[in-house]
């Protein structure tokens, strides 16, 4: 079989970043400095006049919710509808994650056969909540917008339980999913960013720099950060029905079509991009015809 690898090419990616820090350091202020922010406020923390003015000046908007499913509806709308916003800010995700943990435990308790079950046995509620967070992140990776998630901070411990610093207070693998992770700090009157994780050449691991949108834009590329979002067309009902029909006809193994979903960052066929699902349909039709 011929080798299928391609020579690597640089791709202009939207910024996907995680900001965390203690209360009052200015995580929200830092995040809404980015172009045309669509702020999803999960703590009603952006109601003061200062935040309102920043949002107005930057052409932003605010949506307040404490419900994870409402958040998902907004993300899907931003993914698939034409709009003027360029940066999605979820501030903070910690609140929604903790709510997911509580709801997952309650669901497991309700459906348990054990009378004294709490729903938290063996950390199963974490597994349930983490599935939903992974689904969210899959959609965020497809979103043609800058994405900034903020998180509360918590102490980070060494094996001997000595405090060695701070880390984000959320899904513990959240940092794997982002190109940049900043710990936002306040030093006197100045706000600084400590680079806790980077996949980008122009941001050095463990460096500290005065935080501003201008500084980020100079390093990342203003054109990338400020270009208009392009909506993504999802699979039609007809495409979904046709693909399911072909899968059943040919008896495609689940592990095969699950790879198709994973590759497109989709949890179900209805979430697949229109062009991606059409490639699957065309492939199966060729297979039927023996090509």
Please place each PLM-identified region on the residue numbering.
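Interfaces that engage single-stranded nucleic acids at replication/repair/recombination sites
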Residues: 2-27, 32-34, 38, 44-46, ...
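Conserved catalytic network of the ASCE P-loop NTPase/AAA+ motor domain
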Residues: 10-12, 78-83, 139-143, 173-175
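Structural motif
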Residues: 18, 87-89, 148-149
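Short, basic, glycine/proline-bearing loop/turn elements
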Residues: 11-17, 52-64, 117-125
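Conserved nucleotide-sensing/catalytic segment adjacent to the nucleotide-binding pocket
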Residues: 50-114
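Short, glycine/polar-rich helix-capping loops at beta-to-alpha or helix-loop-helix junctions
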Residues: 27, 45-53, 170
